[in-house]
Regions:
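Extended repeat-based scaffolds of very large eukaryotic assembly and lipid-transport proteins
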Residues: 17-318
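Bacterial N-terminal signal peptides
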Residues: 2-14
Length: 318
């Protein structure tokens, strides 16, 4: 009987402790949100950017909320509906100012904790709507949809590793999340993400051609170079072939069917060839670039010639 009583007391105490921790976290979140409402300041660089949410003193409310970590997300989500004003202002050197709302800081906290970008619904003027302005369909239409997105993401990912989440982000609808994933997998030399990056390049090589897709495949190639597996060389060559072809389309003589003069991004071209070089094929990469120089240099405008020459000179030191 004494043992049973002690057991019940222990279980009751543990339940109280767990419940108390949950209540304490929710209360702490509310306290820091109250502090956000008192935040002041102006855009530091005059581009209309959000006034510094992470000052050197990490006792600031945004920094404190980030420290609370992933378990805080369900308590933060309701505050996305808080559109009350802080005392901080976005300022642009062109003259306009805009007072910052509480939920603009809340979304920053959520993005920093999750290492994944969510976005507040885009605000459109009546004139923009009437003119048929296009809004990215991947963005939420309203706060409720945003809250659902974040809650769904949290339930799926709260216990997963950053590696697993970044591998998922390679196929995310938001291109900022895809680029962030490419960069992270390369920077951490994540061999587990290699095949995912290679498959992503295969997808990008299909269908319509645009500069976003070309920048993505170059970013994937760059990360594969950092991961360093020679098995990636074949897919990287495909990226080099694709970018080389479209450079030719941009700079070949008009009578040969030039299209989109100047649309080719030289930085992506050299980025992909640099990846081929670091995988052990430097001579091949340089040879490819020198062929391009001999064929199209004379068709480039002066600034493009200078950019190409500068990049080719650097390439010889890869």
């Amino acid at each position: 009987m004494i043992y049973l009583t002690l057991l019940l007391v222990t279980v009751f105490s543990a339940t109280q402790t767990t419940f108390g921790t949950q209540v304490d976290l929710k209360t702490k979140v509310a306290q820091q949100v109250d502090r956000i409402k008192l935040m002041s300041g102006n855009s530091q660089f005059g581009y209309g950017e959000l006034p510094e949410p992470f000052p050197p003193d990490d006792s600031a409310p945004v920094s404190q909320l980030v420290k609370y970590g992933m378990d805080t997300i369900p308590d933060l989500v309701p505050y996305l509906a808080d559109q009350s004003f802080t005392n901080a202002y976005r300022r642009h050197s062109g003259g306009w100012t805009q007072r910052v709302r509480v939920n603009e800081y809340i979304i920053v906290v959520i993005n920093r904790i999750t290492e994944h970008n969510f976005y507040l619904p885009p605000e459109q003027s009546d004139a923009a709507r009437n003119a048929g302005a296009v809004v990215d369909p991947a963005l939420p239409k309203d706060i409720e949809e945003l809250q659902d997105q974040i809650n769904t993401w949290w339930r799926k990912n709260r216990t997963r590793t950053v590696l697993d989440r970044k591998i998922d982000d390679v196929g995310d609808p938001i291109h900022e999340n895809r680029f962030s994933a490419y960069e992270w997998l390369g920077r951490t030399k994540a061999e587990a993400g290699r095949l995912t990056l290679e498959r992503r390049i295969d997808v990008l090589l299909r269908g319509e051609v645009n500069t976003l897709k070309q920048s993505e495949m170059a970013a994937c190639a760059e990360s594969l170079g950092k991961i360093g597996s020679v098995q990636s060389a074949d897919i990287v060559r495909k990226v080099c072939d694709h970018l080389t072809y479209w450079m030719g389309m941009s700079f070949r003589p008009v009578e040969e069917g030039r299209t989109g003069l100047g649309s080719m991004q030289l930085s992506d071209l050299f980025k992909a060839h640099h990846c081929l070089a670091v995988l052990g094929f430097k001579d091949e990469a340089l040879s490819r670039l020198q062929v391009l120089e001999s064929k199209y240099y004379g068709q480039m405008d002066q600034s493009t010639q200078q950019e190409f020459s500068r990049n080719l000179k650097n390439a010889r030191n890869w």
